[in-house]
From Swiss-Prot:
Cellular component GO terms, alphabetical: cytoplasm
Domain BPL/LPL catalytic: residue ranges: 35-210
Family matches, as InterPro entries: aa-tRNA-synth_II/BPL/LPL, BPL_LPL_catalytic, Octanoyltransferase, Octanoyltransferase_CS
Name of this chain's protein: Octanoyltransferase
Length: 227
């Protein structure tokens, strides 16, 4: 059973979902899972929202205006989510996969770097600032939480979105940090083009061989419902 669980991962594909119900669902899933629960990946977009991580400081939220600011228990500082950005949450039993937190962060960063390489974009990670960058511009944000030896939260990759709300914050606590996205570098690339590459690159890097893809939605209490 353990060997089969190590191979298996469920990939849930959501439509656009408000941040808070998805966050609640991640907490519920992590609290309820046991050593027989398969790992999961959740693919989702969020309506416009700023999320403030555990290390977040109020002074990095400059002019939120009409965009809500929600406190999150992920690592890191403030970032922005909106339509056209692919969020990928990774709910993984790290002990079962024999992964350390730093190894998972590196795998996520390399997943994004590999995905961007598929579209002929040269990207890199930085030791001083988590995430993925193209030149000096940030294209992907990263924030995790570990509970019971299991990860949740994940990455947010800018694909084809309105980047202007990032000007209302200091992204990830860095004043003047410029953002970029795939469609500005390779016009015409969409979320539908990117998501399969992102998922398959992650599965290959982390070593899952038996993915199961399921379209799902959430109810208002943050409980998954079949899509």
């Amino acid at each position: 059973m353990t060997h089969l669980l190590q191979d298996k991962i469920i990939v849930r594909q959501f439509d656009v979902q408000p941040y808070e119900p998805v966050s609640l669902a991640m907490h519920n899933f992590t609290d309820r899972r046991d050593d027989k629960t398969p790992d999961e990946i959740w693919l989702v977009q969020h309506p416009r929202v700023f999320t403030q991580g555990q290390a977040g400081k109020a002074e990095h939220v400059l002019m939120p205006g009409d965009i809500p600011v929600i406190q999150s228990d992920r690592g890191g500082q403030v970032t922005y989510h909106g339509p056209g950005q692919q969020v990928m949450y990774v709910l993984i039993d790290l002990k079962r996969r024999k992964l350390g937190v730093r190894q998972l962060v590196t795998a996520i960063e390399n997943t994004v770097i590999g995905t961007l390489a598929h579209f002929h974009i040269d990207a890199h990670a930085r030791p001083d600032a988590p995430g993925v960058y193209v030149g000096e511009r940030k294209i992907c944000s990263l924030g995790l939480r570990i509970r019971k030896g299991c990860s949740f939260h994940g990455l947010a990759l800018n694909i084809a979105m309105d980047l202007s709300p990032f000007l209302r914050i200091n992204p990830c606590g860095y004043a003047g940090m410029e953002m970029t996205q795939i469609s500005d570098l390779v016009p015409g690339v969409t979320l539908d083009d990117t998501a399969p590459v992102l998922v398959n690159t992650f599965l290959l890097l982390v070593g899952y061989s038996a993915p199961e893809f399921i379209p799902w939605n959430l109810d208002v209490q943050g409980e998954p419902l079949p899509g």
